[in-house]
């Protein structure tokens, strides 16, 4: 089936989803979760085939880890669907309302986008997360995953479609594009009028391609070159702990710190313990000459290092002589995802927050907190680094648009 034909089916399903009640959608989410657990063996068999092909094809260990499923991971994915069912339904929520002077009742209410396209890499969990959050928000979804996860995604979507249909909603609410070729992505990007919004999740090259070539409106999710700035007024022990957590708690996420900026006034106190802690965690430091004075293990940092989202056990480190210099560095190299300051100075914190342009700004906290679950939003589809339509963690409300409902009693203009 062509992408256009699948998009047309999704559009038909979206019309039914738009008027589905919360109880029906939540029942479908629970059915999806139960089916995943019940059919775990066939899911793992498909995943095993993908893993074998990936090893033979030379996929690196990090990609294989993201691709891999086991009984525990499938159970966790199912639990995430149950948690989505417990979240409030955004559809029909009144964003604002008033009675106009002429007596008209005006309400702005949330409505689904309609059809959401998701383009993503080798993460089978995204297949289920995206299907769940789109269904809960009343949207049909077209999924285009990586060819390296083709069998896993096919098995997962088959399970989800059966569960959705069994709960009384259209199976075409959840579809996996039949083709995993680059042409299928191009067709999806050109399906304006059938697909309402396209969300890319993955590396910089994937996101750039979709943003630059799509005629369907795109919500850009986050490449993250996140910084931690250790201010002159920082508590050194707190700063070391935050920097270490931001870099090492999980290496391959978009909210992982990739660069560390240190005010010259605290370099002597901060850098020796920080570099030792990073080295003990297996992190390679790429630093400026000032940083290299504190450790022979520091590699020279290039301009490319400061611009790189490593997603690995590497970090760039630079000494700066002022908050101004830190902000200038972030403006040059940051991606607008998450930036952090460690300081005991409220004026410095306020200035940093005001001047840094990012989806999230942390004060005395790890960059790793930029996450829908950590923010208390529940499920998220990604972290938007653009300013339209959404910014930051994208939960259920961010997968909606609004319309105005005006109720009168015969008023004429």
UniProtKB/Swiss-Prot annotation:
Cell compartments where the protein resides: Cytoplasm
Superkingdom, taxonomy of origin: Bacteria
CC terms in the record's Gene Ontology section: cytoplasm
GO terms of molecular function: glutamate-5-semialdehyde dehydrogenase activity; NADP binding
CDD domains reported in the protein's UniProt record: ALDH_F18-19_ProA-GPR (cd07079)
Keyword NADP among record annotations: yes
Primary localisation category: cytoplasm
Record's keyword annotation contains Cell division: no
Catalytic activity: L-glutamate 5-semialdehyde + phosphate + NADP(+) = L-glutamyl 5-phosphate + NADPH + H(+)
Pathway stated in the Swiss-Prot or TrEMBL entry: Amino-acid biosynthesis; L-proline biosynthesis; L-glutamate 5-semialdehyde from L-glutamate: step 2/2
UniProt-listed PANTHER family: DELTA-1-PYRROLINE-5-CARBOXYLATE SYNTHASE, GLUTAMATE SEMIALDEHYDE DEHYDROGENASE
Record's protein name: Gamma-glutamyl phosphate reductase
Annotated source species: Salinispora arenicola (strain CNS-205)
């Amino acid at each position: 089936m062509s992408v256009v034909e699948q998009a047309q089916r999704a559009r038909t399903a979206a019309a039914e989803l738009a008027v589905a009640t919360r109880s029906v959608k939540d029942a479908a989410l629970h059915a999806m979760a139960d089916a995943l657990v019940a059919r775990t063996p066939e899911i793992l068999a498909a995943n095993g085939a993908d893993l074998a092909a990936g090893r033979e094809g030379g996929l690196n260990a990090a990609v294989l880890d993201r691709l891999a499923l086991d009984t525990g991971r499938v159970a966790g994915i199912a639990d995430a669907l149950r948690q989505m069912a417990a979240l409030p339904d955004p559809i029909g929520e009144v964003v604002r309302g008033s009675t106009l002077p002429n007596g008209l009742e005006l309400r702005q209410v949330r409505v689904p986008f309609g059809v959401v396209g998701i383009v993503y890499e080798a993460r089978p969990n995204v297949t289920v997360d995206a299907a769940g959050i789109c269904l809960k928000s009343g949207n049909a979804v077209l999924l285009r995953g990586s060819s390296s996860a083709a069998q896993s995604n096919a098995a997962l979507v088959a399970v989800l479609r059966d569960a959705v249909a069994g709960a009384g909603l259209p199976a075409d609410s959840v579809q996996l594009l039949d083709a995993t070729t680059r042409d299928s992505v191009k067709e999806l990007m050109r399906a304006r009028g059938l697909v309402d919004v396209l969300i890319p999740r993955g590396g910089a090259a994937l996101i750039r391609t979709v943003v630059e070539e799509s005629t369907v409106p795109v919500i850009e999710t986050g490449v993250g070159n996140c910084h931690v700035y250790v201010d002159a007024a920082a508590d050194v022990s707190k700063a070391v702990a935050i920097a270490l957590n931001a870099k090492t708690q999980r290496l391959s996420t978009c909210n992982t710190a990739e660069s560390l900026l240190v005010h010259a006034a605290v370099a002597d106190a901060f850098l020796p313990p920080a570099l030792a802690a990073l080295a003990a965690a297996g992190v390679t430091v790429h630093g400026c000459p000032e940083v290299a004075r504190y450790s022979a293990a520091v590699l020279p940092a290039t301009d490319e290092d400061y611009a790189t989202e490593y997603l690995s056990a590497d970090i760039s480190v630079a000494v700066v002589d002022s908050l101004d210099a830190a902000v200038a560095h972030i403006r040059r190299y940051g991606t607008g995802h998450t930036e952090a300051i460690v300081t005991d100075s409220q004026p410095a914190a306020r200035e940093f927050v005001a001047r840094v342009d990012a989806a999230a700004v942390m004060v005395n906290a790890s960059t790793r907190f930029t996450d829908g679950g950590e923010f208390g939003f529940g499920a998220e589809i990604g972290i938007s680094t653009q300013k339209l339509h959404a910014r930051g963690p994208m939960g259920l409300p961010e997968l909606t648009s609004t319309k105005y409902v005006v109720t009168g009693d015969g008023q004429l203009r």
